[in-house]
């Protein structure tokens, strides 16, 4: 069942959120590895590789809450909430984290955060939507879409990479087709994120690849809609984290793929660019027993 999330103050709309998974696992031709960490007996993270270049991380939103943390310099002119400056609000329950999009000046798309439109949304752009309750979706923005009160962040970044389960890229695309590369090279470090038909979030990252490599991998992961994220040498980075062994200690991070420039510890703090973090949801309390008859 799909649930509308965008409406409200600006008009009626058609942007929809998928219901969270019910303890599902990845499907498709790829061989996924189950991460040992569990939340309420559910494995929230699976990883795999596609081809020589692309690392993939599959995330279960039924036990994870997603949040955008604005960077100190990007997105440019972003509002900042007090909790965004406090890693203690996301690090203790951190399960996974990954990079967000381009600088706004390098990106035709829009940006919304904490009740403020920083840059207007653009029709047809690939769009991340995050709710105040921790929901996450990737959609294609339509001109009649409007923002409801339960939405915290909307981040557009380029045209969609995958639409209706079909890769929109081509192996022969120009070096600038999916964003400008260092040295105008067709090969670059790249990243992307998408959602499957049942609501799983799949992050993809690669070193020295073309966008088509990401598109092919995400389609193999049964992603229905996907968008390009940040690119070039140091920006594409995705991690998953083991729970701290002792109270007060930091979680231990693991790279999604080889060739990532940054270390897992860098997402334990607010950096210069925005990131997406996935925290473990609080366990659902057991129902009260029915009174004796």
Model-derived regions: residue spans:
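Positively charged n-region of N-terminal signal peptides that target proteins for export
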Residues: 1-4
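Bacterial N-terminal signal peptides
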Residues: 8-19
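Zymogen propeptides
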Residues: 22-120
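Short Pro/Gly-enriched beta-strand edge/turn motifs at strand-loop
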Residues: 37-42, 108-112, 171-179, 257-259
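Active-site-adjacent helix-turn-beta-strand microarchitecture at beta-sheet edges
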Residues: 98-168
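Extracytoplasmic/secreted cell-surface and envelope-processing proteins
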Residues: 106-109, 138-139, 147, 171, ...
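Histidine/lysine/aspartate-rich catalytic loop segments that bind and position anionic ligands
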Residues: 155-184, 190
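Extended C-terminal subregions enriched in glycine
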Residues: 163-164, 182-287
């Amino acid at each position: 069942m799909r649930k509308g999330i965008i409406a409200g103050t600006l008009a009626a709309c058609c942007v929809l959120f998928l219901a969270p998974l019910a303890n599902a696992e990845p499907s498709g031709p790829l061989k996924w590895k189950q991460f040992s960490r569990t939340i309420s007996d559910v494995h929230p993270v699976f990883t795999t590789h596609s081809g020589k270049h692309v690392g993939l991380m599959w995330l279960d939103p039924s036990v994870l809450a997603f949040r955008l943390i604005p960077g100190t310099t990007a997105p440019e002119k972003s509002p900042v909430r007090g909790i965004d400056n406090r890693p203690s609000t996301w690090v203790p329950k951190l399960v996974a984290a990954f990079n967000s999009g381009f600088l706004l000046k390098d990106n035709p798309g829009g940006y919304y955060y904490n009740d403020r439109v920083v840059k207007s949304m653009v029709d047809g752009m690939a769009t991340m939507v995050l709710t105040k309750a921790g929901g996450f979706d990737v959609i294609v923005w339509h001109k009649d879409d409007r923002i409801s009160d339960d939405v915290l962040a909307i981040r557009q970044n380029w045209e969609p990479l995958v639409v209706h389960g079909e890769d929109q890229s081509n192996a022969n695309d120009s070096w600038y087709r999916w964003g400008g590369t260092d040295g105008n090279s067709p090969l670059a470090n790249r990243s992307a994120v998408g959602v499957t038909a049942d609501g799983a979030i799949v992050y993809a990252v690669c070193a020295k690849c073309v966008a088509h490599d990401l598109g092919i991998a995400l389609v193999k992961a049964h992603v229905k809609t996907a968008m390009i994220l940040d690119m070039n040498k140091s920006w594409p980075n995705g991690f998953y984290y083991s729970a701290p062994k002792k109270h007060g200690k930091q979680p231990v991070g693991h790279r999604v793929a080889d060739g990532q420039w940054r270390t897992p510890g860098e997402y334990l703090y607010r950096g210069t660019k925005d990131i997406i973090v996935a925290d473990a949801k609080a366990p659902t309390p057991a129902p009260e027993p029915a009174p004796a008859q």
